[in-house]
Curated annotation (Swiss-Prot):
Function text: Part of the small subunit (SSU) processome, first precursor of the small eukaryotic ribosomal subunit. During the assembly of the SSU processome in the nucleolus, many ribosome biogenesis factors, an RNA chaperone and ribosomal proteins associate with the nascent pre-rRNA and work in concert to generate RNA folding, modifications, rearrangements and cleavage as well as targeted degradation of pre-ribosomal RNA by the RNA exosome.
Composition-biased stretches (Polar residues): 1-14
Record region (Disordered): 1-51, 250-278, 307-338
SUBUNIT field: Part of the small subunit (SSU) processome, composed of more than 70 proteins and the RNA chaperone small nucleolar RNA (snoRNA) U3.
Modified residues (N-acetylalanine): A2
Protein's UniProt keywords contain Metal-binding: no
Subcellular location: Nucleus, Nucleolus
Sequence position, cross-link Glycyl lysine isopeptide (Lys-Gly) (interchain with G-Cter in SUMO2): K342, K371
Organism of this sequence: Bos taurus (Bovine)
Example of a GO MF term: RNA binding
GO biological process, one term: ribosomal small subunit biogenesis
Listed name of the protein: KRR1 small subunit processome component homolog
Gene, per the UniProt record: KRR1
Lineage of origin: Eukaryota, Metazoa, Chordata, Craniata, Vertebrata
Cross-referenced InterPro entries: KH_dom, KH_dom_type_1_sf, KRR1-like_KH1, KRR1-like_KH1_euk, KRR1-like_KH2, KRR1-like_KH2_euk, rRNA_assembly_KRR1
């Protein structure tokens, strides 16, 4: 009996020794912990996980603008139908312009009320029902980015917001394809729906665009990251060497003034007191003159100014009678006849003599010979 008792624990311990030790978090590689396996999906929360339901009732309400009233009224039955599947009540108040969602006694998922709250927020921010209803899925999240307070100047804000959208929405479409998110720009907010990794990139791009960084730089970086993620060897390595480094150029657009004022050196002493009219007269000696003498000096100064102005005016008038300077005429020298183009005088004289002897319309000697030969040939043929 004793031997059997001793053998019992030994066999159990032997089995434990044969088993492979369980891998602890310390033994695992850090990269394996951080990477999510492909195709992994979080298990859905079912009624079996919380059979007794919730203890208290929770509710959320949000306001919506006037222009969304017609659309919400039209699609509200679909919203109620989708939320009733998760045992959430939804009410639309058109008088106050608000939407309310609240839990019931049958609600078993504690987080579904947060997703219902995000649903009505997205509907209020002009997101369509088809896209907003995706928020009720477990692997989908949303982010509403407020951009209204990031730029003070209204014109600058509109320009940067349009830069985010791009010509015919091309920039926004490229961002949606790279991040796998649906993005809606409306007013002072940017609404995004998609996976968590994509929402993080969307927020970064939107905030950088509002900080005057063009979205094309971030889109180029995202394209490179997407290609690098396909390589399994590069997943655990740093990607800094592959990503482009853009230099920010801060161009000063401030126009420099034409007249630059140079600041005077600081002195602790006050500036000297300016001279008054009496001080100036005392310095020049006019203060001691009589009134008649002062008047005479004043008249002389006026006459001198008038004479100077008259002489200037006369000079300007005389300018019209001064002829303009003519350009010097350069006479061209006759070109000397070249030796190649010299005329043969003797041959020319002979030609003139022949022309004088010749009658008008008469044939030349050569032409006469040719004619005679032609006549002889005709006679022979006959």
């Amino acid at each position: 009996m004793a031997s059997s008792k001793q053998n019992g624990p030994t066999t159990a311990s032997g089995k434990s020794e044969l088993r492979s030790p369980k891998p602890t978090s310390e033994n695992r590689d850090e990269s394996e912990l951080l990477t999510v396996p492909d195709g992994w999906k979080e298990p859905a929360f079912s009624k079996e996980d919380n059979p007794r339901g919730l203890l208290e009732e929770s509710s959320f309400a949000t306001l919506f603008p006037k222009y969304r009233e017609a659309y919400l009224k039209e699609c509200w039955p679909l919203v109620q139908k989708a939320l009733n599947e998760h045992h959430i009540n939804a009410t639309l108040d058109l008088i106050e312009g608000s939407m309310t969602v609240c839990t019931t006694k049958k609600t078993f998922d504690p987080y579904i009320i947060i997703r219902a709250r995000d649903l009505i927020k997205l509907l209020a921010r002009s997101v369509s029902f088809e896209q907003a209803i995706r928020i009720l899925q477990d692997d989908v999240a949303c982010d509403i980015i407020k951009i209204g307070s990031l730029v003070r100047n209204k014109e600058r804000f509109v320009k940067r917001r349009q830069r985010l959208i791009g010509p015919k929405g091309s920039t926004l479409k490229a961002l949606e394809l790279l991040t796998n998110c649906y993005i809606m720009v409306q007013g002072n907010t940017v609404s995004a729906i998609g996976p968590f990794s994509g929402l993080k990139e969307v927020r970064k791009v939107v905030l950088d665009t509002m900080k005057n960084i063009h979205p094309i730089y971030n889109i180029k970086t995202l394209m490179i990251k997407r290609e690098l993620a396909k390589d399994s060897e590069l997943r655990s390595q740093s990607w800094e060497r592959f990503l482009p480094q853009f230099k920010h150029k801060n161009v000063n657009k401030r126009k420099e003034p034409k007249k630059k004022t140079v600041k005077k050196e600081y002195t602790p002493f006050p500036p000297p007191q300016p001279e008054s009219q009496i001080d100036k007269e005392l310095a020049s000696g006019e203060y001691f003159l009589k009134a008649s003498q002062k008047k005479r000096q004043k008249m002389e100064a006026i006459k001198a100014k008038q004479a100077e102005a008259l002489s200037k005016r006369q000079e300007e008038r005389n300018k019209a009678f001064i002829p303009p300077k003519e350009k010097p005429v350069h006479l061209k020298k006759p070109k000397e006849a070249s030796t190649e183009t010299k005329i043969d005088v003797a041959a020319l004289k002979e030609k003139v003599k022949k022309a004088k002897n010749k009658k008008l319309g008469a044939l030349t000697a050569e032409e006469v010979k040719l004619k005679m030969e032609a006549d002889e040939k005709k006679k022979k043929k006959k």
